[in-house]
Amino acid sequence: MDFLLGNPFSSPVGQRIEKATDGSLQSEDWALNMEICDIINETEEGPKDAFRAVKKRIMGNKNFHEVMLALTVLETCVKNCGHRFHVLVANQDFVENVLVRTILPKNNPPTIVHDKVLNLIQSWADAFRSSPDLTGVVAVYEDLRRKGLEFPMTDLDMLSPIHTPQRTVFNSETPSRQNSVSSNTSQRGDLSQHATPLPTPAVLPGDSPITPTPEQIGKLRSELEMVSGNVRVMSEMLTELVPTQVEPADLELLQELNRTCRAMQQRILELIPRISNEQLTEELLMINDNLNNVFLRHERFERFRTGQTAKASSEAELATDLIDMGPDPAATNNLSSQLAGMNLGSRSVRAGLQSLETSGHLEDDFDMFALTRGSSLADQRKGVKYEAPQTTDGLAGALDARQQSTGAIPATQARIMEDIEQWLSTDVGNSAEEPSGVTSEEFDKFLEERAKAADRLPNLASPSAEGPPRPSPGTAPRRKTQEKDDDMLFAL
């Protein structure tokens, strides 16, 4: 298409744009730039020729100094030219295929060019948002934001209005216009209840443009300074606060500032088309741009804050969905209650301990009996120390001494056992001297002797303190016979 139309730099405005964007220039030629704006506004083909020349200088140019000069010319023309040039620049095709493509990473643009393009797109999107035929740049701007592109912060002191809205002339003869003005007045009254009121200059009869008095101008500027102060405080808070670590009090103050500033912006937008003072209009437009910038920062801040909150809540929901591999508290309590319900009284515990001790004693007795059964009588007698009859009386006495030493029987019972042993030894000695044949008379005599021996037996319940009498020396044969009988008893 450009080939059919010829060289873009052949037209009068194209020639001037070529000179204004020459790479040999050290800085911008503002006189030439303003001359370009005049040609665009005064000629019929000026907007199209200028647009083609600027597009030619930017598109595919690797000399970023020339690109930077062309962007400056383009910005100057947008701010100083009318709607005809805005329609061409705000086209979505131009913004995407020329401006955005220039700052792609493959072209490796310098930071100054990158920030310049993004600043132009952002400022145009804010300025042309309310114009239906200039929303192409708005769509590109919103698309870039959705993709996560961070736009640089604009210098609030260097901002200037892109275009000044035309003065609105109201027709006093139209009733519908009068109704709309009255409705706007009521809306301003409602907003004044929620925000710091801006003074509304007196409306002249016939709803003509407002010409404020010097006193009203001074009051209006004092209110605008208050608005600028709120914007400055809000901007500083957005700079200092961290979205993920904001305190509730700071967040509440920030939200209150946001609501107040939005109400103030609404009042400013209502005053801009009605103020006839050009200087006041420029101040209102500049404050409006500052408000738009701080609102964008607040939206980005809220997006980060709400995003982190949603992430934390999703992690909490994920943690609740995980299977708990630890012990179930209900099962643990149930087990504890079951153990508490078991009969573990002192009686049952004592009975269990006694059964263990009894089984231990039985095992010891069985081991001793097995040892006795497994060894011969001669081996057993080797461990027995035979002393004088006065000390120990036979094997029974030795066993009694062992039991006394182990604490099996008391000392008094040992004395009783000695008396019984003496009685049995006497009977055994008398029966050993008798012949093997026994008649009835001898048996009767034996019974009488046993009866006499029973009379000589001491009282078991109250044994004498002196102890049993010492055996006479004549009892030695009887003791040997007793030992033989004991050997036979153990052999069985």
UniProtKB/Swiss-Prot annotation:
Ubiquitous. In adult brain, it is highly expressed at the mesencephalic level, in the hippocampal formation and medial lemniscus. In cerebellum, it is highly expressed in Purkinje cells and granular layers. Pfam families: GAT, VHS. A motif (KRKK) lies at residues 48-56. The GAT domain and the VHS domain are required for the interaction with polyubiquitinated proteins. The VHS domain binds to phosphatidylinositol monophosphates. The KRKK motif within the VHS domain is required for binding to phosphatidylinositol monophosphates, with a preference for phosphatidylinositol 5-phosphate (PtdIns(5)P). It comes from Mus musculus. One of its GO terms (cellular component) is cytosol. The keyword Phosphoprotein applies. Keywords: Acetylation, Cytoplasm, Endosome, Isopeptide bond, Membrane, Phosphoprotein, Protein transport, Transport, Ubl conjugation. Residues 215-303 form the GAT domain. Adapter protein that plays a role in the intracellular membrane trafficking of ubiquitinated proteins, thereby participating in autophagy, ubiquitination-dependent signaling and receptor recycling pathways. Acts as a MYO6/Myosin VI adapter protein that targets MYO6 to endocytic structures. Together with MYO6, required for autophagosomal delivery of endocytic cargo, the maturation of autophagosomes and their fusion with lysosomes. MYO6 links TOM1 with autophagy receptors, such as TAX1BP1; CALCOCO2/NDP52 and OPTN. Binds to polyubiquitinated proteins via its GAT domain. This is Target of Myb1 membrane trafficking protein. GO terms for biological process: autophagosome-lysosome fusion; endosomal transport; positive regulation of autophagosome maturation; protein transport; regulation of endosome organization; substrate localization to autophagosome. Residues 20-152 form the VHS domain. Residues 167-215, 450-492 are annotated as: Disordered.
